[in-house]
Amino acid sequence: MAVVLTGAAHAASAEPSETDGKTPKAAYISLIIDDLGQSPDKDSRALALPGPVTLAIMPDTPHATDFARQAHKAGKTVMLHMPMDPATGPYAWRPDLPLTELESRLNAALLKVPYAAGINNHEGSRMTAEPVAMNWLVGELQRRHLFLVDSRTSAKTVAAAEAQKIGLASLSRDVFLDDERTAEAISGQLQSAVRLAHKQGSAVMIGHPYPQTLAVLERELPKLKAQGIEWIDIRQMISVRGNRATAAHGKDGVYR
C-alpha cells in the first residue's frame, strides 16, 4: 500500500465520529469523473476542472489512450474505468468467463489506458458480486501496485471487502452526483457529499461528463474551501481512510 498511500498521512483517521463520538476536525472530499474517452470536448472540459480531479477512462472508447496521456501530462490521476457485467464489449468482465479470459481482458484494457494508477468498475452490478473473480482481481491489482475504487453499483458488491481482506489500497464511493441529470439534483448531491464529509470526515464522489454535471462542478468546486472542505486526490483519500469502511458500508471499519 505504500506505493499509493502518500500525502495525507497526517490525517490518519478521518472518521472519528464513527469510533469515538466526536465530530471530525477535518472534512475531506475526492472526486472521480467516470466514462471518459468518448468525446474530446467533454474530456477536455473534465480535464479543465479545478483541483485534484481523478479521471476514469473507459478502454473501449476512441480517445482512451490519447486522453490518458494528456491527463497524465497535466498531472491528473488516471484510472481505468473497467467495464463489468452488465456492461458489454470486448473488455467487459462477465461471470461466465474463466479467470484466464478475465486476465486477458484486464491486460488489454490497461494497455488502452496508459498511466492508470488504479481501477474502478463501470456498471458491474453482477460482476462485483462474484467473490472468486473479485478475489482474483484484488490480488492481481496488488501485484501490479494498482489501487481499487469500488463504485458500489450494487449493494451486493464484494469488491471492497475482498480488497480489505488482503490489504489492497482501496476505498468505496459514497455519493453519485448525477443519477438525476438536472442542475438542481446535481447541486443537491454535491451538498450531500459536503454534509457527509463533515459528519464522517470524508466523502468520495463520482460524476460523469454530462453537460449539467460539468456546469455545476465548474461553478461549485471553487467554493468547497469556504464550506470547510479540503479537496484531496483519490490516493490521498485512500491514506486518509486507511482501508476502513464507512458506516454506510460496514461496521467498525470492516466491510460487510
Describe each PLM feature range.
Residues 1-7:
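Bacterial N-terminal signal peptides
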Residues 7-256:
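Catalytic-site microenvironment of enzymes
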